Amino acid sequence: MARTSENKRHSKYVIRIVCEGDKTKPLFFTDLCDQFYGDSKDFDVRTIPQPNIPVEDAEADSSRGSYKGKKRKVKSGGQKDVAEDEVITGVPPLKWVLYARKIMSEGVDESWAVYDKDEHPKHEEAMAEANKIIDGKKVNIAFSSRSFEYYLLLHFEYLYYNFDATECGERIKGKKQIYECGTSKNPDKDCDGKKCINGYARKHGYWMESKSSVSTFPLVKDKLLKGMINACRLRTESDSKTDEPIYKRNPYTNVDILVGRLIGKETVNYGTTYTFRDHGSDWSVRLDEKGLNLTNNKNSSEIFQRGMFMIYDREKNSKKELNEKVLLLDSGESDLLPCTLTDSQVISIKVSHEKEVLLLPNFII
């Protein structure tokens, strides 16, 4: 693939994550990318903008509950992509999608726009622009409603709830003063977690705040799988209750799809067929009330190694082989692996060294 501008020097597969804001989301994804791609020889994955935390802010103490977060200081010097320092102008959220489109034309292989519902005026236009396929590429969107903090919340529990805001507060002389709900600092105005996400999080001891110079990634880095499963479950429930565009829904998030893309995991809803085509293979699986349905789609036989299909129990942190012997399917042949999953179980399929597919149970809505 031809590369132009700053990206001519790239020989790796380049992913850029264009974020709303310069703290919460860039901090989260920068830390995630550092952990999973810090020494990668094949991928160049970074956020735009890079976290812009003043040195004095990064050195200040910040209470975030029962964990120590990672503080990021502004970097000076060194080689950086021009794009990382460029100010993105325009009307949100369309401006982030347009920028993600622009950098793909300059050699970026895959781009994502990460933003919240908020009160942005151009949601419909942003979604339409993202879905345009130009030169074989589209812009991927990682969207949250009410906000990114709802995605974080799903790492601690499953909740389908319509919050009014991330933080309760009021504007005084043009500046928002937050009530810090859940701390009893403003008892007359404290929503007790009924209206704002951070108030709910404080009440339940998940975190104290989310808008400082400290990354939220340490909060959930050991719960990423739980967050992915709960987010997929949330979309299933949302789809069962409304057919409105996602930018009109509350709650909603698909940030987990981006996270899964980065950590090599993909969730598949109950009853949905997943097809794998790679390395000469072509087969499909679907989970239903009888168990795991497996079909060989190619014109020759397919071998499935013992233990390729596992039942993983998240609560017990245990795995059990679903296929206790090697499976051989002729062309067009199907097989059924009987199983019934609880809410805490998923079927894990390691389709390659880099990727794991997770088939979810039939959650009660």
Model-derived features with residue positions:
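Conserved beta-strand elements of the Class I
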Residues: R16-V18
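Structured loop/turn residues at secondary-structure junctions
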Residues: E20-G21, D118
